[in-house]
Amino acid sequence: MSTNSSKATSEPFLLGGDLPVNRLGYGAMHLTGYGMWGPPADERNAIQVLRHAVYELGINFIDTADSYGPGDNEEMIRKALYPYPKDLVICTKGGMLRSGKLDWIHDAPGAPYIQPLGDPRYLRQQVELSLRRLGVDCIALYQLHSIDPNVPLADSLGELARLQEQGKIRHLGLSNQPGVSVAQLVEAQKTARIVAIENLYNVADRADDEVLEHATRNHIAFIPWFPLGHGGLVGPDSALTPIAEKYAITPSQLALAWLLHRSPALLLIPGTTSVTHLKENASAAHVILNPAEVRAIADAVDRAGLPSWRPVRDAQVQTATTVR
C-alpha cells in the first residue's frame, strides 16, 4: 500500500461516454435538516462544504434528489455553486414520495414511510421542478429514484426518455431500495439508455457483486450508496481499523480506497457535513492498493462478520393508494 496517485484511482470515469467525472464525488443528502427534512440547520456550513468540495478539492460529481428536503437540497446546491463550473456534473433523482422525517428507517415503530411513485405525469412534474431548483436547462444525470411496482417500468422510463429527447435530461440512471437487479437493468435498457445505477454496496456488503460486474462490463457507472456502511465498518472496533493504522490512514479512507480499486465503474459519493471529513474522504483517492491487499481487506471484513443494513428488496413498498 502507498499514498500516491495512480491511474486506477485518478483516471476519470466517462459518464455516458461523454462526461468525465472524478470517481470520488460527493453525496449532498446530509446537507438538509434533521431526518433529511427541511433546510440544513447551519446553511453557512453547508455552503462552505459544497464550495470546498468543488473549488478546493476538485470534486466534479454531486449526487442529490428531489426527496432530500424535499427540494431543499437541490436549492442549497444552487445557492452555493451557481453559476456552476463547466465540468460540474449534478445528478438528481425523482420518483419517491416521503411522508416525514426519518422515513428511511422502515423498522422504527410508527415511522413514516417512503413511497415509490413512477407515474409518468408525476415524473415530468418532478423533472421540471428539479430544473427550476437547480437553475439549469438540462439535468446532466437524472435517475429514477425507486422502481414503482404499480407502474410498468417502461412507462416510467419512457416518460423520462421523452424528456431526454426534449433536451431536459442528458443521461438517465436507475436506483432502487436496496438496489437495481441485473434483470431490472436489462429490462430498463429496452426502453432507455441507462448509463448509471445507484445501489447499496460497500466492502461489508457485496451482495450486488453480480450487478457490479454487469455494470463494469457494459461501462455503466455503479454509484454505491452507504459506501462507508452503517457505522460499524469505520468505527474504532472495525476490522478495518488495525489495517488502516498500519498504513497511517483512517478506516474511512481505507473503505473508500477499497471501492476505488474494486472496479473502475464505481463512482463514490460519500457524504459529510464537515470540511475536515470531506478532506479526509478526498484523500482516499491517493491510497494505492495492490490486488492482494484488496482481497485481504475483504477477507478481514468477512471474518469479522460485520452486520449489513440491507432492507429486503421491495418488501417495504406500499401501494400508491396509501398516499394522501
Predicted regions located by residue number:
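Active-site mouth loops of central-metabolism enzymes
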Residues: 31-44, 108-121, 145
